[in-house]
């Protein structure tokens, strides 16, 4: 009897051990199969993501994919002059694209009010972009015509195009000729020439306004920024560009060469926030000075020099000197706070000292310098 019990127990142990081994082997097999399956799914997802990222703006519209858009521009790019967000040209375009193509556009802005091509180039190079953008709307020129020469405007505008193409060769760029020009000029001609060279179809809102049959004062309350009625023409003009390119299945990944020789000066971007001499400025995410005569000095061997600073309420003024020669005085006082870039020189040769010296401070105000941009 005892012998039978012992035999039965031994048999039971063997069975349990066998089952345990089978379970362990099966679990390992399942785990391995799950790992292989997970790897395959990851590869499929990566392949899908890669396939989608290889699609250009218009191909994504054809496939009803989501769109990432970047807006580079000034206050008109922001739709300043509207009474509500629904009147903003970009929101009208987003609504139209959603309705017509069943694609959702997500937008990110770079720069804003008072922007010139100089500031846009600096901000774009300084930005830490985490998305791959499918389309970019460039809305510049209004402020440039009062701040830089056409030959300077064209090299910064072209450098912006090249920078965007380097970020994504498939990116679609839609330049906007701003209605505030009122008539075509040397700055709008730059945009037209660059558009032709880089196979870009621009949105001509000068023509749209002039052919509208409406007085400019009807489409703009301050005779610069469009109002809600004016921005309707922006949206319609941009939508027409998009639709024409959609129907023609436009190719956006193109071979290109630099159009303007001066643009080659902007191949490199260097942001220098370490002055060689600091007399009185406090270091706080930049350099803050609040007394006349406080100064910063940067030594440079580069051809390009741009001062990057903060415009803000209770600002002040500073003078810029190159090798002790006065270049210009810059006013940093503004009704709102915004970073700004001012072109100081772009044809320097040899060694130079650039000195920034506070010349005036508004009561309880300050001047904030962010750095010197060179090439």
Identify the role of each PLM range.
Residues 1-14:
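N-terminal Sec-pathway targeting helices
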Residues 40-109, 126-129, 306-309, 348, ...:
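Serine-esterase "nucleophile elbow" of acetyl-processing enzymes
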Residues 184-265:
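Catalytic His-Asp segment of secreted/periplasmic serine-dependent ester chemistry enzymes
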């Amino acid at each position: 009897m005892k012998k039978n019990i012992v035999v039965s127990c031994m048999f039971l142990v063997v069975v349990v051990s066998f089952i345990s081994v089978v379970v362990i082997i099966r679990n390992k097999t399942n785990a391995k199969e799950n790992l292989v399956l997970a790897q395959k799914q990851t590869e499929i997802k990566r392949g899908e993501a890669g396939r989608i990222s290889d699609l250009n703006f218009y191909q994504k519209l054809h496939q009803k994919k989501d769109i990432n858009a970047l807006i580079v521009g000034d206050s008109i790019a922001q739709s300043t002059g509207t009474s509500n967000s629904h009147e903003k040209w970009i929101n009208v375009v987003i609504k139209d694209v959603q309705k017509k193509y069943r694609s959702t556009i997500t937008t990110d802005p770079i720069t804003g009010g008072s922007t010139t091509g100089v500031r846009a180039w600096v901000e774009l190079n300084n930005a830490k972009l985490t998305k791959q953008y499918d389309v970019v709307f460039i809305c510049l020129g209004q402020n440039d015509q009062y701040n830089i020469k056409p030959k300077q405007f064209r090299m910064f505008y072209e450098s912006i195009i090249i920078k965007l193409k380097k970020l994504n060769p498939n990116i679609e760029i839609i330049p906007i000729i701003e209605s505030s020009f009122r008539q075509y000029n040397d700055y709008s001609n730059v945009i037209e020439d660059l558009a032709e060279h880089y196979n870009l179809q621009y949105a001509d809102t000068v023509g749209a306004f002039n052919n509208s049959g409406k007085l400019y004062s009807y489409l703009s309350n301050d005779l610069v920024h469009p109002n809600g009625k004016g921005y309707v023409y922006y949206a319609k003009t941009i939508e027409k560009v998009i639709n024409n390119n959609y129907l023609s299945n436009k190719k956006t990944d193109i071979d290109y060469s630099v159009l303007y020789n001066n643009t080659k000066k902007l191949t490199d971007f260097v942001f220098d926030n370490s002055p060689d001499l600091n007399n009185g400025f406090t270091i706080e995410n930049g350099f803050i000075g609040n007394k006349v005569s406080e100064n910063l000095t940067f030594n440079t061997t580069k051809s390009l020099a741009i001062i990057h600073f903060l415009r803000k309420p209770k600002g002040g003024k500073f003078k810029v000197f190159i090798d002790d020669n006065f270049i210009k005085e810059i006013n940093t006082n503004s009704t709102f706070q915004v970073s700004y870039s001012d072109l100081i020189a772009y044809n320097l040769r040899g060694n130079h000292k650039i000195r920034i010296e506070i010349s005036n401070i508004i009561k309880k105000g300050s001047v904030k310098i962010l750095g010197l941009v060179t090439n």
